[in-house]
Amino acid sequence: MHQLEAERPDRMEEACGVFAVQASEQPVANLAYFGLYALQHRGQESAGIAVFNQGKVRLHKDMGLVSQVFDQDVLARMPGDLAIGHNRYSTTGSSRVCNAQPVVLMTRLGPFALAHNGNLVNAAELRERIDDGQVEFTSTTDSELIAFAVQQAVDRGLDWKAAITSAVSLCQ
């Protein structure tokens, strides 16, 4: 057997689907919808899209397939020029709407949205480090831990790039 063959699984392995888009001339919610639809095989438990518009974020997420979570009325109420979307295949946290992504948090620099595909092996340690008594966890996902790590770094005075770098450095 060749090394390349050994590295390829003989079955499909699932994980969440993440899609982001920035466009000023097109409705990004629609583009994110179609991106998530194309990635739907990656996760079919829940879907969500966060759209940024003039410093504010509009978030819509729910349980179900992309076509069940979003319709044209929902997408029309999500104007903006930047979007991030997520299809969930749960590996950490139960299959409940509170665990649907993206995660949106407020920081001193404004809103922040995060969608994550993967698992943290140090989630328990990261939760202990982040939980300063002020954090109100709303999910059981490790993705929320990353978002709170970014939020705390921003609120300590870091800019976006430094805050994200700091948060990622805590993740294993």
Describe each region flagged by the PLM.
Residues 1-172:
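Conserved short alpha-helical segments that host acidic/polar catalytic motifs at enzyme active sites
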